């Protein structure tokens, strides 16, 4: 399928919202823009996906998130029932659409019978890695684009050790994605239904406290820290990423 056919496929899909369809209609006469958005899918690697947030096959949007998550879910399902029960921890940063994308991923995992622990709001990447290990999850997903400009978002994936996927798992997901139709090949469950059924569970303050306790337990010179704590000056920059948790916990710690 060439890029123009892919564009027409998306334009005709009932999966698109009215706003998404209008966005595509607005570029109907811009052949270069259509080619840029539909010449091929984003490449899935050990760091997952990253791209600008537009409607299109080569961009970050809820349909690409669902498609990527279906591929990830297929790999987890192949590990067996125990892996599905261990489930996936999901967090997000403060970028536009990050919460929407995180929920979209959670709904696909739930639709595949995989349990999800979803952070209620933005969290930093280290806390996701901690949650994966703390709760014995099979994997993790972080909706973030790190240092990239605000137009970008990303989909980072982690395995049970809290680290980014090893190459063989990333390759397995990439191969699965080649077999999945971005619209018809995705299984998903309504968010509220998944919460009621217990497939999606939210995480919040309790996990925050466990994470901070784990971090502060690593302090190896508490006496020195206590001496300088009241006068220590810190310059902090959010750099488009998770801000609320960091600042509030730093002030309490």
Annotated model-derived regions:
Residues 10-13, 81-160:
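Ferredoxin-reductase
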Residues 69-88, 220-230:
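Glycine-rich phosphate/diphosphate-binding loops that line cofactor/substrate pockets in enzymes
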Residues 245-253:
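Single conserved hydrophobic/aromatic residue that forms the stacking wall/gate
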